[in-house]
Curated annotation (Swiss-Prot):
Annotated keywords: Cytoplasm, Stress response
Record's protein name: Anti-adapter protein IraM
Gene3D superfamilies assigned: 2.40.50.650
UniProt xrefs under InterPro entries: Anti-adapter_IraM, PmrD_sf
Lineage of origin: Bacteria, Pseudomonadati, Pseudomonadota, Gammaproteobacteria, Enterobacterales
Protein family per UniProt: Belongs to the IraM/RssC family.
Native organism: Citrobacter koseri (strain ATCC BAA-895 / CDC 4225-83 / SGSC4696)
Gene giving rise to this polypeptide: iraM
Length: 114
């Protein structure tokens, strides 16, 4: 089974991420996962017995939970998870990396130094 990532969020306090995915017959799920690979909009993932393939390559991704999709649940995650990169097309600098547990920003932002 393949899922296409339609949207994503990262949680800087837990080091986890959420991916809104769509599969066969437009069946949607929200994947809560952790790993050293960030699923971006447009990524295609395939769960396999040996792990998770993302865009055809095995990646270090651990799926923590799969939620059935609802607008209310996705909105709740979006409203409660505070990351400057969530919901924007690009982010170049982040003033909040001191509070972030990610070693490298999943969105590619650099730390703002003052």
């Amino acid at each position: 089974m393949e899922w296409s990532v339609e949207n994503n969020l990262v949680c800087p306090t837990t080091g986890t991420a959420f991916a809104l995915t769509s599969g066969a017959e437009n069946l949607k799920f929200i994947l809560w996962y952790k790993g050293d690979y960030f699923l971006r909009t447009g990524s295609v993932i395939s769960p396999e017995d040996s792990g998770v393939l993302a865009n055809g390559k095995k990646r270090n991704i651990k799926i923590l939970h799969v939620f059935p999709y609802s607008n209310a649940l996705w909105a709740s995650f979006h409203n409660r998870i505070d990351c400057p990169g969530n919901g924007v097309v690009t982010i170049n600098h982040c003033a909040r990396q001191q509070q972030c547990v990610f070693t490298l920003c999943p969105y590619g932002a650099r730390t703002v130094t003052g």
